[in-house]
A protein has these predicted regions:
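Extracytoplasmic/secreted envelope proteins and their assembly/folding machinery
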Residues: 22, 86-89, 93-96, 123-124, ...
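Soluble non-cytosolic domains of exported or imported proteins
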Residues: 1, 16, 48-49, 79-90, ...
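Structured beta-strand-rich core segments of catalytic domains in phosphoester-bond hydrolases
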Residues: 2-65, 73
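Secondary-structure boundary elements
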Residues: 30-32, 59-67, 94-106
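Active-site metal-binding loops of divalent metal-dependent hydrolases
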Residues: 73, 113-114
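Metal-dependent phosphoester/phosphodiester hydrolase catalytic core
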Residues: 62-94
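Metal-dependent phosphoester-hydrolase catalytic domains
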Residues: 49, 98-107, 116-220
Length: 220
């Protein structure tokens, strides 16, 4: 079924010690690839630290140029420190700044698993992703902020919902009615189906995971 849909991927091996990579899946019918770049996340105070790279992909979407920055920031597993995610945030911010320096109206979408919530300093301060749509030129808009504020998320831990999976947009995609693509207010959402949620047992109401530790349990 997927083969007939004509999907393609952008993938570059990352330095991550667990072998986890980031990738972009896209339909060739709608998106024409122009450039691909891998940006390593380097902690200068801990050069032995290895994590996922940032995948920077630019292409044409319906005659408009758009850049995707694909993220999978350092994990919280085993008490993973927020300083590592701040390093990732600063790295992503430097990529954004370099794009905006060339074109202040550049259309940029940062997406992926940030392993932090919208209010956490890595996102709100270091990446400068804000909830308000009244943005200065360099700020980004976090389309998922209000969703998390309402108590929704994509990860349940000890009964509390976290929203690590986020979509963050540059000003070039906000309220630009003269362009074909712009963000429509409150259009961001979390895909929800009953079969994605545990219906019984200890984790009733939490997402049905693919793995429990190293054991595959058949979820998503």
């Amino acid at each position: 079924k997927l083969k007939s849909r004509k999907y393609s991927i952008v993938h570059i091996n990352s330095p991550d010690k667990r072998g986890i990579d980031v990738a972009l899946l896209y339909k060739t019918k709608y998106f024409s690839l122009l450039t691909t770049k891998s940006v390593n996340v380097i902690d200068t105070s801990d050069l032995e630290f290895k994590t996922r790279n940032l995948l920077v992909v630019t292409g044409i979407l319906s005659n408009d140029t758009i850049t995707f920055i694909i993220n999978h920031w350092p994990s919280r597993r085993g008490g993973g420190k927020d300083e590592k995610r701040i390093v990732a945030a600063n790295t992503a911010r430097s990529v954004v700044d370099s794009l905006l320096k060339k074109n202040m109206n550049a259309k940029i979408i940062l997406m992926g698993d940030f392993n932090d919530n919208p209010k956490d300093p890595s996102i709100s301060k270091h990446l400068n992703a804000q909830p308000e749509k009244k943005l200065n030129d360099m700020a980004l808009f976090n389309a998922m902020y209000n969703i998390h504020k309402k108590g929704y998320g994509t990860l349940s831990y000890q009964g509390i919902w976290n929203l690590f999976d986020q979509m963050i947009l540059s000003k070039g995609l906000i309220d630009n009615k003269n362009e074909k693509y712009f963000y429509q207010k409150e259009s961001a959402s979390i895909f929800y189906k009953k079969w994605l949620i545990n219906q019984e047992g200890q984790y009733t109401g939490a997402p049905f995971r693919a793995f429990s530790g190293s054991e595959y349990i058949g979820g998503y």
